[in-house]
């Protein structure tokens, strides 16, 4: 691959054919390393590239994930296969299971024109970076927080998520259990998301029926009796006769 553009990322995708995905500032290209198509020139997959640190691989789907300012995109060797709208500048991306991990740059960098005089790189050390975990399947933000420092590295290992900050700290994140996730959704009255989560996790019918009933109780308290009855009917196996 010959290009005048800076290469911002490299990822291998191994299947029947081993493909190298190459990102530059203005395009995504593929180059077959072994298998059918080996020896052919690199092929442009997308006329939009990404920044350094914004190309990664989903180990579960084997898709290549690209984070841009407008959205997060997934690719296979044939082209784009999915996109998830999430606007804002991105500095780093990584995957944990089927979650997309994103780090956004410090506010002082994204708002550079409005900074007061006398500022310098030292100020950025104390600026906040935003760390976000997206669940594309459920179309929700699973976690978001402001970090008091820039981020040097973002990765997952040993079943956990790690962030290394510019000031030398290592932050570790552990995924909540299924029951803990449900409790959070119940507290926020996100019952439809709770149902979707249960179906995604393929929990048994008894557990799903408990969620239907909780949703029915919530709707009944709100006075939405018809919809509440629909949920009770879905959970009929776990509903005691009145």
Model regions and ranges:
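WD40-like beta-propeller blades
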Residues: 1-103, 107-155, 169-212
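Solenoid-repeat scaffolds in large eukaryotic assemblies
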Residues: 194, 225-229, 241
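Alpha-helical solenoid scaffolds that mediate protein-protein interactions
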Residues: 201, 235-236
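Short helix-adjacent coil turns
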Residues: 188-193, 223-224, 236
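Alpha-solenoid helical repeat scaffolds
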Residues: 213-214, 242
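Extended alpha-helical solenoid scaffold regions that build the rod-like backbones
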Residues: 138, 159-160, 239-242
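Alpha-helical linker/edge segments of TPR/alpha-solenoid repeat scaffolds
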Residues: 156-157, 220-227
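Residue-level signature for tetratricopeptide repeat
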Residues: 184, 214-222
């Amino acid at each position: 691959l010959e290009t005048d553009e800076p290469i911002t990322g490299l990822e291998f995708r191994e299947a029947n054919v081993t493909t190298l995905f190459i990102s530059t500032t203005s395009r995504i290209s593929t180059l077959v390393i072994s298998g059918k198509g080996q020896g052919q020139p690199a092929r442009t997959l997308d006329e939009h590239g990404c920044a350094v640190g914004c190309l990664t691989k989903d180990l579960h789907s084997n898709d290549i994930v690209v984070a841009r300012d407008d959205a997060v995109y997934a690719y296979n060797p044939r082209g784009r296969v999915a996109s998830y709208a999430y606007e804002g500048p991105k500095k780093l991306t990584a995957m944990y299971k089927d979650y997309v991990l994103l780090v956004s740059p410090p506010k002082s960098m994204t708002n550079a024109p409005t900074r007061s005089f006398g500022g310098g790189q030292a100020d950025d050390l104390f600026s906040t970076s935003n760390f976000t975990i997206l669940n594309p399947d459920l179309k929700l933000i699973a976690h978001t927080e402001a970090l008091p420092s820039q981020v040097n590295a973002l990765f997952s290992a040993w079943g956990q998520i790690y962030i290394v900050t510019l000031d030398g700290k290592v932050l570790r994140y552990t995924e909540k259990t299924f029951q803990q996730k449900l409790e959070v959704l119940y507290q926020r009255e996100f019952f439809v998301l709770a149902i979707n989560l249960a179906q995604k996790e393929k929990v048994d019918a008894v557990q799903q029926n408990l969620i239907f009933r909780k949703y029915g109780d919530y709707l009944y308290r709100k006075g939405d009796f018809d919809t509440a009855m629909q949920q009770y009917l879905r959970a009929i196996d776990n509903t005691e006769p009145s």
